[in-house]
Amino acid sequence: MIKKVTIEKIKSPERFLEVPLLTKEEVGQAIDKVIRQLELNLDYFKEDFPTPATFDNVYPIMDNTEWTNGFWTGELWLAYEYSQQDAFKNIAHKNVLSFLDRVNKRVELDHHDLGFLYTPSCMAEYKINGDGEAREATLKAADKLIERYQEKGGFIQAWGDLGKKEHYRLIIDCLLNIQLLFFAYQETGDQKYYDIAESHFYASANNVIRDDASSFHTFYFDPETGQPFKGVTRQGYSDDSCWARGQSWGVYGIPLTYRHLKDESCFDLFKGVTNYFLNRLPKDHVSYWDLIFNDGSDQSRDSSATAIAVCGIHEMLKHLPEVDADKDIYKHAMHAMLRSLIEHYANDQFTPGGTSLLHGVYSWHSGKGVDEGNIWGDYYYLEALIRFYKDWNLYW
C-alpha cells in the first residue's frame, strides 16, 4: 500500500492553459537542431563518451566508467529512430558492446545506477532491433543491481559498502533504475526481479516522499531492524528542502512503475508529487535546481529536472482516468514546460562536443556542472521531443 499524501490544488492553472500547445512542426524543428548537434558530437566522441556535465557548455571526452554514460547512447538511439541515419546506429551499437564488456568486467558498477547505464543503451537496442548482445548486457546488469537489495527495509542500497550503517539508504533516483528489473522479469519470468522492484518502489513511496508530497533526496533505514530512520539530502539545498531533479525523478518514476504494478494508488501519489512540482515553477515554467527557489532568488535553474518532469507527465497521461479533473492542466503544463525549454534553453551554437540543453545543474554542493549542460538533460530533452513528435516505444 502507498500512504496518503497531500495533493495540492494546482495554483493559477491559467498560466499553463494560456500557453499555445506545441505543433508537430515546432517539435520537429527542435529535434532537427538536436540532430545537428549530435552529428557534430558523433565525430567528436567517436566511440568514447561525454562526461556527466559540460565545462563552458562543451563536454570533455571520457571512457565508459561513469554512471551517466548510458544517456549518451540513448540519445544516439533516439536520433537513429528519428533520422534513420546508420551513423547513429553504428556508434550506438559499439557503445552497447562496451557496456557488455563493462558488466562482464564489473567496471565501476558498485552502485544503484545500473538502470541509467543499461536501459537507454542496451535495453533500448534490444527493443529496437532484438539484438542478442544488448539483451545479454541488460540482464547481466539486472543481476548486478539486485546484489544491492537489502531485505531489512526492502530496498536497493544506493551507494557504498553493503549493509554499513552510514550507507544504508535508498535514493529517489532509483525509481528509474528499477525499470531494469521489470524488464528482466518480463524476459525471464523469474519472480525475484519483480518482487525486488516492487518492494523498492513501496519503500520509496512510503518514505522518501514526504507527507506533503515533496521529497527527500535520500532516506536511511536502520540496518539492524530495517525500520525507517531519516531523510537527508545529498544534492538538494538542505535536508528539509526539495531538490528539483529528485522531485522530477518521482514524477517520471511513478508512472513507469504503475505500468507494471497497476496499483491505482499510484495516481494520487503522482498527483501529489506533480502538483507540488508545478506549483513551484517560476514564470518561465523551468524549475530552479531546488524547489525552495523561485523568481528573484539569483540561483541556477536545472533544465534537466524540467525535461524529466515533461516525460513523466506525458507517460502518466496514458494512464490517468479520463475523469481526472487535472488531466487537461497536466497536458497544457507539459507543453508549456517543453515550449520554454525549446525557446529559451536549447543550445543553438552547434559546437563540437556541445550540449543540446543549457542551464542545468549537476551538483550544486560540489560545484560541479552548475549552470552547464548535462548529459541526462540532453537525453530527456530529446526523449520529450520524440514523445511529442511520434508514437514512441519507450526504452524504460
Swiss-Prot record:
The active site is at 113 (nucleophile), 173 (proton donor). GO terms for biological process: polysaccharide catabolic process. Signal peptide: none annotated. Its EC number is 3.2.1.180. Keywords: Hydrolase. GO terms for molecular function: chondroitin hydrolase activity; unsaturated chondroitin disaccharide hydrolase activity. It catalyses: beta-D-4-deoxy-Delta(4)-GlcpA-(1->3)-beta-D-GalpNAc6S + H2O = N-acetyl-beta-D-galactosamine 6-sulfate + 5-dehydro-4-deoxy-D-glucuronate. InterPro entries: 6-hairpin_glycosidase_sf, 6hp_glycosidase-like_sf, Glyco_hydro_88, UG_Glycosaminoglycan_Hydrolase. Optimum temperature is 37 degrees Celsius. Substrate binds at residues 113, 173, 231, 233, 245, 249, 363, 366. It is an enzyme of class 3 (hydrolase). SUPFAM superfamilies: Six-hairpin glycosidases. Optimum pH is 5.5. Catalyzes the hydrolysis of unsaturated hyaluronate and chondroitin disaccharides. Also degrades unsaturated heparin disaccharides. Releases 4-deoxy-4,5-didehydro D-glucuronic acid or 4-deoxy-4,5-didehydro L-iduronic acid from chondroitin disaccharides, hyaluronan disaccharides and heparin disaccharides and cleaves both glycosidic (1->3) and (1->4) bonds. Prefers sulfated glycosaminoglycans compared to unsulfated glycosaminoglycans. Probably required for mammalian cells invasion through the degradation of extracellular sulfated glycosaminoglycans such as chondroitin and hyaluronan. Belongs to the glycosyl hydrolase 88 family. Monomer. This is Unsaturated chondroitin disaccharide hydrolase.
